[in-house]
Each structure stands twice: as structure tokens, then as C-alpha cells.
Amino acid sequence: MPAIRHLSGLDNGFDQPILVFGASMGAMHAANLFFRRPDIFDSVFAISGIYDSDIYFPGYMDDVLYRNTPCTYIPNMPADHPYIRQYNDRKMLFVVGQGAWEDELLASTRRLQSVLESKGIHARFEYWGHDVDHDWPWWYKMVETYLPQFID
């Protein structure tokens, strides 16, 4: 990350904000990177992600899984954790459809929204229609709709 910040500074005259973005499994990775390092990443844009581990590992938890499952570690953050302020100073957008192959992702996104709200973390959640499937054509439309909002 230091090299990216340095090179962007050389090309632009100042450090550029760094957005983490992903769809499907990439959304989970983007969200996890952002939540674990809000000091590095300025924003997160996650589409159709799963943010808890129960879907893949029902009833199982170890330290590695815990540290990589936002719906598990965020509830245990103290109310005065400095990351909470940092989260609220940054842009967060989570988008999911409600069509084919989105059921588990929709439920996980709603759980993440509930977790964040319970901690006073102000993220934006967008729920697209029941015709919006877990597939690239829809993700392209979501990117076209929302990515410009991250570019200042």
C-alpha cells in the first residue's frame, strides 16, 4: 500500500484515496480488508457478498475464521474503538440483489447492516429488485450506477 500511495502521489501531486471493491467472494474480501484496516482504505464498495462464516462453516469458529468474518468480530468491538470513528469518516456501500442465487447473500448483507447499525456505524445499503440475480450483467449495472459516487 505504501508504494501505491507513493506512485499515485507522484502522478497526481497528492495521495489518492484507495477504494476496495469486489463482487461475490470479492465483496467479502473487500469488506474484510476495509473493516480490518480503515487506516489504509478510504472506502469500500461491495456487491453481493457474504459477510459471515455460518454459510460455509456452520457451527465452526477458530481464530483465523473469527478475524476474517466481519459479522463476528465487529459486534465484539468496544463502543469507543477508534476504528468505529474511522468507519464513519469513510464511504461504505453494500449492494445486493434479491433475485436468483442471492438468498444467502441477501440474508448476510442484512445481518451486516444490523451489526453495523448496532455499533453506530453508518454505512449505506442498497437492495435491488427481485429480478436482480447474482450475476455479472447486474454487477456491471451496479458499478455503473454507484462507482461515480466514489470519485470526487
Could you describe each region identified by the protein language model?
Residues 1-152:
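Non-catalytic cap/lid and distal C-terminal segments of serine-dependent acyl enzymes
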